[in-house]
């Protein structure tokens, strides 16, 4: 089944989805991309009420706190969860922002999938050069401390139920990507890491998240400290 693209044609996607639900008996909608997850979250109440379907994603007020990378980093800072130094980036605060994060650093859009819009900058001149085009293309964003990582990434996958309990968790240690410099994981192992599970579950508790969430974690090479990078708010 082919449907309109939710990002480029949100109205047509909505019409398609509602027609499909009216004609097809569906019990649960499980969004598999950031775009569909955001749309389902924004329209969750209507879809569940009219079509009698359950949407496996929180309402948008909660969803947005995880999906928006700036809001997530601000939350981590408030509650003391490990994360890279991150600050809102605007045309007027480039010098102040870079003084906080230091160089090298990453320009990161608040809303993006994968590595889209992420730009590495190693000095203030480069930041001044590339920021306008990144902002024009991807919208609001942050400047984030560049993590010299160990070469290993972690995915922490959790399911928090409506009673605040963790119904399941998995920690995946990603050893290799394709392409090699960053992409889709192609060599991973499941590991036991209660520390990572506890850190990530505490974040979900603070935003009252219900359902599945997938954290991306880096490990700093020199200190061995973990850093929350983002949440993929979908299955």
Regions found by a protein language model. Give the residues of each.
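Active-site nucleotide/adenylate-binding loops and adjacent lid/helix of ATP-dependent enzymes
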Residues: 63-150, 160-165, 194-197
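Active-site charged/polar residues at nucleotide-handling catalytic sites that mediate phosphoryl
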Residues: 23-24, 101
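Protein kinase-like catalytic core scaffold
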Residues: 105, 165-167, 225-230
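ATP-dependent carboxylate/phosphate-activation module, predominantly the ATP-grasp catalytic core
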Residues: 125, 129, 133-134, 145-208, ...
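Conserved metal-phosphate-binding beta-hairpin within the catalytic cores
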Residues: 205-235
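A short, GP-enriched loop/loop-strand-helix hinge that lies immediately N-terminal to
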Residues: 2-4, 24-67, 82-85
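Glycine-rich, highly charged phosphate/nucleotide-binding loops
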Residues: 1-20
């Amino acid at each position: 089944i082919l449907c309109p693209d939710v990002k480029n044609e949100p109205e047509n996607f909505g019409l398609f989805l509602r027609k499909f639900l009216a004609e097809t008996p569906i019990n649960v909608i499980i969004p598999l991309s950031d775009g569909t997850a955001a749309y389902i979250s924004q329209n969750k109440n209507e879809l569940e009420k009219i079509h009698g379907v359950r949407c496996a994603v929180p309402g948008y007020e909660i969803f947005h706190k995880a999906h928006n990378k700036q809001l997530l980093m601000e939350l981590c800072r408030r509650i003391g969860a490990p994360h890279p130094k991150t600050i809102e980036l605007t045309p007027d605060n480039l010098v102040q922002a870079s003084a906080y994060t230091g160089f090298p650093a990453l320009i990161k859009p608040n809303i993006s999938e994968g590595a889209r819009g992420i730009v590495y900058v190693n000095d203030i001149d480069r930041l001044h050069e590339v920021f306008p085009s990144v902002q024009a293309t991807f919208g609001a964003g942050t400047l984030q401390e560049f993590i010299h990582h160990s070469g290993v990434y972690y995915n922490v996958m959790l399911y928090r139920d409506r009673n605040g309990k963790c119904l399941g968790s998995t920690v995946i240690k990603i050893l290799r990507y394709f392409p090699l410099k960053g992409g889709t994981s192609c060599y991973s192992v499941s590991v036991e890491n209660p520390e990572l599970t506890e850190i990530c579950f505490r974040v979900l508790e603070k935003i009252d998240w219900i359902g599945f969430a997938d954290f991306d974690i880096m490990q700093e090479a020199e200190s061995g400290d973990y850093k929350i990078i983002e949440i993929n708010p979908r299955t």
